[in-house]
C-alpha cells in the first residue's frame, strides 16, 4: 500500500525542484549517487572530518543501490562541497538494530559490544517496517554559513521518503562542544 498520495508526491517533487534550483543559483551542481564507496572515499579526504560513518561505508555495511544513496553538491570545478546519505532498513524493531550495532556494522559481527546509550521516552512506538536512516552529513568549511546546512539534509530526507516509501525516518546525533 502506498504511503503517499499523488498530491503528497507532487509536493515532495516541487520541494526537490525548488531546492535543486536554489543550489544552481549558488553555483552548485546537485546529484544523487548510488556508489557509497565514493562517498566514503570523499569523506576520508574531506577537511574537518574526524571519522567516516560505518553505516554508509561499504567496508562495514551491506549497501546497494536498492537500499542506499547519497546526495552530493559540487562546485563549478567539480569538487564535492557537501553531501549526506540515506539508507533503508526493513525490520521488526529498529531499536534492536541500533542496540546490536547492525546499524553501524552489518557486514561483520561486533564481538566487543560497548554500552550504547539510547535516549528515547518509554512511550516511543516501535519503529518497524521500512525504516530510513540519514547521516554521514558533511559541508566543506568554506561553504558553511550560506544556508546549505538547512537545505541539504531536507532534500535528502525528501528523496529518501519518496525513493524508499518509508514508514519511519530518523537520524542520530551526538553532543559536541559547540
Report the location of each language-model feature.
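Acyl-donor binding region in acyl/amide transferases
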Residues: 97-178
Amino acid at each position: 500500500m502506498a504511503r503517499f498520495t499523488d498530491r503528497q508526491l507532487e509536493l515532495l517533487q516541487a520541494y526537490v525542484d525548488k531546492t535543486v534550483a536554489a543550489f544552481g543559483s549558488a553555483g552548485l551542481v546537485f546529484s544523487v549517487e548510488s556508489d557509497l564507496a565514493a562517498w566514503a572515499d570523499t569523506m576520508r579526504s574531506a577537511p574537518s572530518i574526524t571519522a567516516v560513518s560505518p553505516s554508509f561505508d561499504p567496508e562495514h555495511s551491506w549497501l546497494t543501490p536498492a537500499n542506499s544513496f547519497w546526495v552530493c553538491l559540487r562546485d563549478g570545478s567539480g569538487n564535492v562541497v557537501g553531501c549526506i546519505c540515506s539508507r533503508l532498513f526493513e525490520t521488526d524493531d529498529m531499536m534492536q538494530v541500533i542496540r546490536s550495532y547492525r546499524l553501524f556494522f552489518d557486514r561483520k559481527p561486533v564481538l566487543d559490544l560497548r554500552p550504547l546509550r539510547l535516549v528515547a521516552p518509554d512511550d516511543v512506538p516501535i519503529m518497524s517496517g521500512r525504516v530510513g536512516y540519514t547521516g554521514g552529513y558533511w559541508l566543506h568549511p568554506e561553504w558553511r554559513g550560506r544556508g546549505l546546512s538547512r537545505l541539504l539534509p531536507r532534500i535528502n530526507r525528501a528523496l529518501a521518503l519518496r525513493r524508499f516509501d518509508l514508514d519511519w525516518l530518523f537520524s542520530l546525533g551526538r553532543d559536541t562542544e559547540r
